[in-house]
Amino acid sequence: MAGHSKWANIKHKKAAQDAKRGKIFTRLIKEITVAARLGGGDPNSNPRLRLAVDKAYEQNMPKENVERAIKRGSGDLEGVNYEEIRYEGYGIAGAAVLVDCMTDNRVRTVADVRHAFTKYGGNLGTDGSVGFLFKHCGQLLFAPGTDEDKLMEVALEAGAEDIIAHDDGSIEVITAPYEFVAVKEALEKAGFKAELAEVTMKPVNETELTGDDSVKMQKLLDALESIDDVQEVYTTAVID
């Protein structure tokens, strides 16, 4: 893993997310709605919903918006019925890309995703073409200077799978998806606040890009992110 660039990449990702706050609200509302539809409207018994609600509040989403989305999902209010779809493909220099979507029109979505891949030098693959290059897991990243020994003790006790100390001083905690909330809460209770905390698709191996390849890959990722139906974009690319 490229430890030296981990922290810079996370800070870049956070800045990009902050710049797209309006779109983040839309995505979170979709996620809350679908999570409530699939697992019920009680966050205490629905880990996926709990995670989505926590993220919404971290983004300062008004409580009434959150509650309305839960009611739409659980059937108490009328709403759009979204379908979850994952597309797989390749970007620049063979970097793998996963694109998670929620849509009410599959034909529109696949056309938009294919157009972005084609326009910016990638290509849309078939189901299963790159999914095996990622691991579904919880990920928490802590700033350089964090007490590694204490964090490791708390994280492992709470059920974390792995702790990675990066070259830049940041510390990464990996969990099984279903253990993520418990580990996050245990660490917060012990005074550890993650700079990034999410259930994600983590690359098994990373593809480091530099120069023109970095610029081209970023354009592809930005194009995919800008599609209304896209919820998340994951890639093995590390952009210098």
Swiss-Prot record:
Subcellular localization: Cytoplasm
Any one Gene Ontology molecular-function term assigned to this protein's record: DNA binding
Annotated TM spans: none
Matches recorded under InterPro entries: Integrase-like_N (IPR017856), TACO1_YebC-like_2nd/3rd_dom (IPR048300), TACO1_YebC_N (IPR049083), Transcrip_reg_TACO1-like (IPR002876), Transcrip_reg_TACO1-like_dom3 (IPR026564), YebC-like (IPR029072)
HAMAP family attached to this UniProt entry: Transcrip_reg_TACO1
SUPFAM superfamilies named in the record: YebC-like
Keyword entries, A-Z: Cytoplasm, DNA-binding, Transcription, Transcription regulation
Highest taxon listed in the record's lineage: Bacteria
Similarity comment: family membership: Belongs to the TACO1 family.
Single GO cellular component term: cytosol
Primary location: cytoplasm
Protein name: Probable transcriptional regulatory protein Nmul_A2722
Lineage, highest ranks first: Bacteria, Pseudomonadati, Pseudomonadota, Betaproteobacteria, Nitrosomonadales
Biological process according to GO: regulation of DNA-templated transcription
Pfam hit, one: TACO1_YebC_N
